[in-house]
Amino acid sequence: MKKVLLFALIFAGICSFTIKIQQDKPPILVKENSISYLYGSKALKTEGSVSKQNGNFMRFSGPATMEWSIQVPAAGTYEVQLTHSVKTAADGNSVTIATGNSTVNYTLVPTQGVFGTGSYERILLKDKLELKAGTQQLTLTVPATAKGPVMDLRAVELVPVAGKAAIQADERQAIRSRASTEWLAKAGYGLMFHYTSQSVSRDGSKLPYETAIDQFDVNKYAEMVEQTGAKYVIFTIGHAQQYCPAPIASWEKAHPGMTTKRDLIAEIANALNKKGVKLILYMHSLGTGNFGKVDNPEFYKTFTDILKEFGDRYKDKVAGYWFDCWYQIFEGYPDIPIQDFFKVCKTGNKDRIICLNSWIYPAVSPWQEYWAGETTSPVALPKNGTIERGAGMGLRYQSLLIMEPYWVQDKAAMPPPRFTAEQLSKYIGECMQQGGAVTINMGIYQDGTVDEKALQVMKDVAAKIRK
């Protein structure tokens, strides 16, 4: 990537700004029947007090400009949505979005959602843009009068007025196609386990992955889960390294040498199901489909071949999927056939539910049933089972907490639980009253056991919630 960095001094060194030009960025094709997303990573130029942050968003701390090159097939009118976060808004802080002679202005106000003031929210702006046919530049400007911090920007979204009916019809179809999530709400709470190739034994040593899978005591594990009162488990398949604890041919094809002879997935599903506990599988979507290493069609085929085999093999033994990394996938492969993906996920079980993790951002698509809810700590409660604004809006509420200050137990020492039984019981109980569910990620050792202190917390939760 060729970058030109220019540094200039203004007013004798009182103020400075940086211009970043990325000359190899192709124009973004603006769609006529679906939403087009202009991410910071796709910008042709940035200038002023704006910088990219971890999580693929742009932080505006003062006056700044971003510019995208767009290719418009035919002239048309477009609504503008701003997916952004504003914690506090200084008087007069605003943004201007313009192309050619068409301009949209918006006065920034604090955004809201389950994370409180400053949550990411998708806001439809009042005015519309008139786009001419052909290649052109679209700019977003924060004026010189702005006082920081201004906002964090995820994307500018262009909604074709002529295609809005089709977009709304697709959303209605997605909602109609969803499987019931009532069982999740009735369950109230469950557990998640990041059992991965990075998990260690209690002494800090680590067995080869397949050896650890062969020695995993399924019955002891299921008995432990039963003691917690959890009614579902989210179990990790693949993570930082793409190991799968089952002999899945399509997985072996995509990730040679990273499957096992023992089908631990089936054994865990059977053991849990006998105890009235449902199994949801976590998949690291980037790694599962080799994101970034292959193009969109190959990524999609790899991923869906795996899902079809999983579906045919496990049928109703797998009640759901928790798909990670979908804001990255949707940014990298915006044309992924999401409706078809949704249908593939139902292979073998039409009632299977899925979520597409968008982290703290609004949902990437309505083609999912429940909110991934990667919150790590309690957040605002649902209303009637869902969320009214921001991340998770319109989806079944499921909040995912971490019992330890990390996801994977890759060290011998297990820190004290982050929550007491009283704290968890209060949050779970209040969520259940509003139709939501809470999942607690527990650190797990390579032998399938957990920390006794954390286990006691969950036993106490069970005594309070399941009484």
Where would I find each of the regions flagged by the language model?
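Bacterial Sec-dependent N-terminal signal peptides
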Residues: 1-23
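Mature catalytic domains of secreted/periplasmic carbohydrate-active enzymes
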Residues: 21-74, 84-467
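P-loop NTPase switch module centered on the Walker A-proximal segment
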Residues: 80
